[in-house]
Regions:
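ER/Golgi luminal nucleotide-sugar-dependent glycosyltransferases, focusing on the catalytic module
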Residues: 1-184
Length: 184
């Protein structure tokens, strides 16, 4: 994996994923509750997020240069048109490389809103304190950090950006989600 410039992780649960055979990048399907598919299987908790965090901590030392995380749907309201067309577009890499946040770009078209109403839930659940605070400190120093960011967890991220945090961060996030999420 480490030699790949781009690698796609498709989070799969129950949809038709035949479209994946048409994407130009190497890819792997990430399953839910399929022990025979290990290491590409995660508990059915927290939707695609457990797939993302499990992949990042398990493959931390051999990550591709850039990882593209997508959901199982070729067509969905949160991305424009066909995911095949989006991933195969000659504009995808220039879009990613020109992102305001180096090493990260959302490929969704729906922006997030204000985080402020969600902060009490993040604190009450223990999520921020147990997973984020050791690395980022007090949540209130970040102001409105979600406003207009791409929603729905489909994105491209560089190995360098992932490794700006230790492997333990991703493992802790995965474990917290598995222990504290209702099956999805």
């Amino acid at each position: 994996l480490a030699n790949l410039e781009y690698f796609v992780i498709v989070s799969y649960y129950d949809a038709d994923i035949s479209w994946t055979s048409k994407i130009k990048y190497p890819y792997e399907i990430y399953y839910k509750e399929k022990p025979d598919k290990q290491p590409f299987s995660a508990p059915n908790k927290a939707k695609s997020e457990t797939n993302i965090f499990k992949f990042l901590y398990e493959f931390y030392d051999k990550l591709p240069q850039n990882i593209i995380f997508v959901h199982q749907y070729e067509y969905k309201w949160y991305h424009r048109g066909s995911l095949v067309d989006l991933l195969n577009s000659p504009d995808l890499v220039p879009f990613y490389k020109s992102s305001k946040t180096p090493g990260y770009a959302s490929i969704n078209c729906v922006p997030l809103g204000d985080v402020k109403p969600q902060i009490p839930k993040m604190i009450r659940s223990g999520w921020w304190k147990e997973t984020m605070e050791p690395y980022f400190g007090n949540i209130y120093k970040y102001h409105n950090f979600t406003k207009n960011k791409g929603a729905a967890a489909q994105f491209i991220v560089s190995r360098e950006r992932v490794r700006s945090l230790p492997r333990e961060f991703y493992k802790n996030m995965f474990v917290w989600l598995v222990k504290n999420s209702i099956g999805d």
